Amino acid sequence: MNYEDVITGQGIEKKFKNFELNIPELHIPKGFSTALIGENGAGKTTLLNILAGIRRDSKGDIRYFEQKQNIEDALVKERIGFTGTKNFFMGYWNGDQVKEMMSMLFDSFDADKFDGICRSLNIDSTIFGKRGKSVSKLSDGNRMKLMLATVFARNTDILILDEPASPLDPLMRDMLGDMIRAYLAEGDGLRSVVFSTHNVSDMENVTDYIIIIDDGRILEEGFVTDLKEKYILVKGEREDLAAAEQHLITCQSNSFGFEGVALTDNMNKFAGMDVEFDTPNLFNISVAVMKQNSKLTMPVL
């Protein structure tokens, strides 16, 4: 697939005491929704914070909009919206103060649009008005909805969203998917979204491109359609498990049969076995790739 990059990175590094993010090359495709997937502590938040300019103590060269531009440049900041896992509102602010601060910080912030989004998302109305309660009183889900309202109320070209679905209920996760699709559609190929998620199944319908990270490094990346051709889901009977398992990246089995993920190029190795092939979903692919490098082991229960 031919595409342009909206963000590119070279030699991105950030060292901590017991962890190192090391991304030799990074490509975020323009006009698409990119999901960053990985275990807890894999480096997703660190990478997104670097891209959003929250962390400025990393090494490497990052280019936005096909040019080398400083994330501190006001024109670049104006074109990027960011939500993080930590509440970036002052705890004592109420809804009106949030709106006032966003209006001061970003020229494209539309206060009326913000009000409309807050109503549509059913955000607790008691935070608004002269005696509105502080945003610290909101539930985790409502705080995330409020953060989303601030970025969707701006005219941006990139949204960087760190775990936006995590605190949301199933209905709001579905709504978030609709909002991302609408945002991309309104940009007519010029807008892009980058988000991290553990809710792979819930967010699959809005994911075009994935980057799977483990221990600070990229394990796999590509358009979802391409990866669904690269990998194949294999299902078979119990009697073929021993022969099939050696060709599977991951495998789950019970007394009736097995299911696992393999490389499509290895389909011929299942010849003579009573197996069925199917298209894997994004969850199947992500877990298969992550399990190859994971330190997790099944405990004795």
Question: What residue ranges belong to the model's regions?
Answer:
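The feature captures the beta-strand-to-loop junction immediately N-terminal to the Walker
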Residues: 37-39
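Conserved ABC transporter NBD signature motif
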Residues: 60-71, 75-76
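A short, flexible loop at the N-terminus of ABC-type nucleotide-binding domains that lies
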Residues: 1-25, 30-32, 73
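Helix-to-loop junction immediately C-terminal to a conserved catalytic motif
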Residues: 52
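ABC-family P-loop ATPase nucleotide-binding domains
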Residues: 84-146
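C-terminal coupling/interaction segments
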Residues: 249-301
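Catalytic Walker B motif of ABC-type/P-loop ATPase nucleotide-binding domains
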Residues: 159-163
